[in-house]
Each structure stands twice: as structure tokens, then as C-alpha cells.
């Protein structure tokens, strides 16, 4: 395994980019990645196996946006740990912990975490309102995520969302979005190898201005 980069950035980065309006009101600007030594995989290999392992056990990537937001990505799959996406969103008015399903908002006038279900229900997407119950039933492994995205693809391609919905549903990401998210893998490899901050390689100023009011 002669690789040394963040090999699976999209799982966490995709939802964060949608939340932050990346490609609409903001753009990814710079990336810096760090890697630990490679030990975890080696411990589970035969002593006779001389396959070189260069992928660090933990790859930490910090992404700066043009608007001043910081995105932190961690690839951590070769060391012992319980499964967790460690998904968290924090801003000037509060913080949401997606793993433990809890939230803290400054307006709550409390210094303790609160259960997030009641608050998130106020902001459920149209797609989840339409298909959320079926999604959880048929896609328990990924908590409905795969099901919802596939239904969005089908709705977009056929230009029909559902018999009980008004209007059509569009897939929430473009090919440009997908290319941008996966480019983190290549850019992180450069950052780790050359020990430096790396710019995202697209001319974003004009695009940012054009999309600023979307």
C-alpha cells in the first residue's frame, strides 16, 4: 500500500460542504494534511509479508474556506476503535454533536447538552419528509443515507419525486462537487509529501462572485 493521503474524504466532507454552501456562497481554498506513522495494518500482517505500508494510521486534514470556515477531516481506520463518524458542526450560536445526537444553542440559557431530535425535526429536508421512514427501514447500516441519495438520483433522472410531493427534486450535488470533494485525496498526498499548505486548483474568484447570491 504505497499511498499516503486521505483516501476517503467524501463521507464527511460531502455533508459539510452542503451545510456550508460550498460552491454556492463559499469555496474551499487551502488544505493542510498530516500523517502518523504506519503501524496498525502491519500488526495484522504475516511476518513474511514484506508489502510496504506507507498509509499513516491517522490522516488529519485541515481545510480553509474563502469565507473563513475551517473543516477538519480525519481518516482513522487501521487502529482499534469503535465505529464512529465523529460528525460535529460548530458555529457562533451553538454546536451540534451528530454522533451522540445532542445539541447546544446559546439561546437555550443552559450550560448542558440537549437532545437534538426536537430541534432537527424543525429543519427536516423535503427528501427526509418524503422517504425518511422507508430509508431507516431499508438502510439501517447507514441510517438511511444511501437510500435517500439513491431516491434523489431516481427522482432527478425521471423528473418526478413522488406522487405525494409538489414539484421535482434535484440531486443535491453536481459532478463538479464530486470532483472537488475527491480532489482532497490527491491534494492531501502533496501536502503530506512536501510538508506544506496546498491550494485547491481552480479559479474560484469569478465563480464565487457569480454564485454568491444563490
Identify the residue ranges that each predicted region occupies:
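Short, mixed charged/polar active-site loops
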Residues: 70-72, 95, 170, 197
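Stable alpha-helical structural segments in soluble proteins, enriched in small hydrophobic residues
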Residues: 141, 145-153, 181-195
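C-terminal glycine/acidic-rich active-site capping loop/insertion
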Residues: 43-52, 56, 60, 64-65, ...
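C-terminal capping/lid region of NAD(P)-dependent oxidoreductase domains
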Residues: 190-214
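Short linear motifs in exposed loops
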Residues: 74, 99-100, 201
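Rossmann-like dinucleotide-binding domain that binds NAD(P)(H)
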Residues: 4-82, 88, 176-180
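Alpha-helical scaffold segments in carbohydrate-active enzymes
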Residues: 37, 95, 184-188
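Short, compositionally biased segments
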Residues: 1-6, 163
Amino acid at each position: 500500500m504505497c499511498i499516503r493521503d486521505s483516501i476517503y474524504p467524501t463521507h464527511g466532507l460531502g455533508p459539510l460542504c452542503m451545510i456550508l454552501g460550498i460552491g454556492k456562497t463559499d469555496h474551499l481554498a487551502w488544505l493542510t494534511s498530516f500523517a502518523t506513522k504506519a503501524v496498525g495494518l502491519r500488526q495484522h500482517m504475516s511476518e513474511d509479508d514484506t508489502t510496504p505500508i506507507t498509509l499513516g494510521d491517522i490522516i488529519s486534514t485541515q481545510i480553509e474556506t474563502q469565507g473563513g470556515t475551517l473543516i477538519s477531516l480525519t481518516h482513522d481506520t487501521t487502529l482499534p476503535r469503535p465505529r464512529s463518524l465523529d460528525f460535529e458542526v460548530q458555529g457562533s450560536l451553538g454546536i451540534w454533536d451528530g454522533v451522540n445526537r445532542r445539541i447546544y444553542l446559546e439561546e437555550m440559557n443552559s450550560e448542558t447538552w440537549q437532545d437534538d431530535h426536537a430541534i432537527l425535526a424543525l429543519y427536516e429536508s423535503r427528501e427526509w419528509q418524503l422517504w425518511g421512514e422507508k430509508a431507516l427501514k431499508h438502510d439501517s447500516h447507514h441510517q438511511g443515507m444511501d437510500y435517500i441519495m439513491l431516491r434523489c438520483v431516481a427522482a432527478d433522472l425521471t423528473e418526478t419525486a413522488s406522487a405525494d410531493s409538489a414539484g421535482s427534486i434535484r440531486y443535491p450535488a453536481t459532478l463538479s462537487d464530486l470532483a472537488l470533494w475527491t480532489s482532497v485525496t490527491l491534494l492531501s498526498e502533496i501536502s503530506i509529501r512536501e510538508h506544506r499548505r496546498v491550494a485547491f486548483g481552480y479559479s474560484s474568484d469569478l465563480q464565487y462572485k457569480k454564485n454568491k447570491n444563490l
